[in-house]
Every structure is written in C-alpha cells, then in structure tokens.
C-alpha cells in the first residue's frame, strides 16, 4: 500500500513539535519558512498572525507539492500594538514594561495547505493577565534568557508562567499551537496520520 501525502511542519519551534506529539501527530518532516515577519502598516494583530501563518505555509508548500503543510504564527499584542519576538535584552525589557500589570492578547494563526492546494486557516485569541513585576522579578527573568526568540518576550511554559494571573482561552495556543483547532484543520482537509 502506498503511503499518503506527507505532513510538513513549516516551523522550527520545538514547542510546536512537542504539542503535536501530545495529540499523536508526528510530522514527516520539518521545513521552517524564512519570511519577513515585519507587520504591515496599519495591520491589526489578528490579521498579522493569520497573514504570517498563511505566508509560511505557502512558502513551504511551493517546496513540498503534493504534501500537507502546516504553519503557525503567534503574536502577543497590547491593544493594537504588536510586541516583537525578543532577540535582545532591550526587546525583552520593552515587552515586560508593556506587559507588567496588564492584560494582553496572544493570537495564534494556523494555516494548512492540502496536497490539492486547498488552504484553510484558524485564529485563536487568548486573553492573558500579567502581574505587576518588581525590578527583581524583571531582572531575574532577563538573566534567565528564557525570553530569547519568544513572541512578546516570554514563554508561559517557563519562569514567566509565574507572572500569569489569568488565562482565558487556549493554553496550547499561548505555547504556540492551538491543538483543538489544528486537529480540526487537519481532519477537515483530509489528513490521516
């Protein structure tokens, strides 16, 4: 019996691989998309997350014709302000200053392209409350380095989990991939593990 189309994960995130494994989905290969993630002028956080997820999926689908391609992008926003993926201490300090003592939104866009070219997307929005951070908490978190490469400068599954006062929505989405919605996309477009 011939194998069906492969599932390609268009992400280098080990967290997304771990989340998929939790629900019994193992991509056949990982092929990260390297795209410009700069927000467009006047782009809302919702549109930004969906656009990036779909763009990543399309870039990888062009390299993997006939396969399923799954991509996601997670955006942290305070109001309409999209926070960066923290790469420097200045980035994380900027993010923590905006997040401290406030609620914010974590939006994860998910895109799936089927072997026949059909595409489907989902957006999951989660409201997250952050405690007011003391200087010692902020400095300790910065020193930990756990913020590197994370949207909004934090990962809920690490030390920053202790800063979360409230989470309304999808915990896996805040980590990087909403599992319920992802499984529905996969089954809806005909993926069978």
From Swiss-Prot:
Its EC number is 3.6.1.9. GO terms for biological process: nucleotide metabolic process. It catalyses: dTTP + H2O = dTMP + diphosphate + H(+); UTP + H2O = UMP + diphosphate + H(+). Its cofactor is a divalent metal cation. Its main location: cytoplasm. The record marks 15, 74, 157 as: Important for substrate specificity. One of its GO terms (molecular function) is dTTP diphosphatase activity. One of its GO terms (cellular component) is cytoplasm. It is found in: Cytoplasm. It comes from the Bacteria. Keywords: Cytoplasm, Hydrolase, Nucleotide metabolism. It is an enzyme of class 3 (hydrolase). The active site is at residue 73. The keyword NAD does not apply. PANTHER family: BIFUNCTIONAL DTTP/UTP PYROPHOSPHATASE/METHYLTRANSFERASE PROTEIN-RELATED, BIFUNCTIONAL DTTP_UTP PYROPHOSPHATASE_METHYLTRANSFERASE PROTEIN-RELATED. NCBIfam families: maf. Nucleoside triphosphate pyrophosphatase that hydrolyzes dTTP and UTP. May have a dual role in cell division arrest and in preventing the incorporation of modified nucleotides into cellular nucleic acids. Belongs to the Maf family. YhdE subfamily. This is dTTP/UTP pyrophosphatase. It comes from Caulobacter vibrioides (strain ATCC 19089 / CIP 103742 / CB 15) (Caulobacter crescentus).
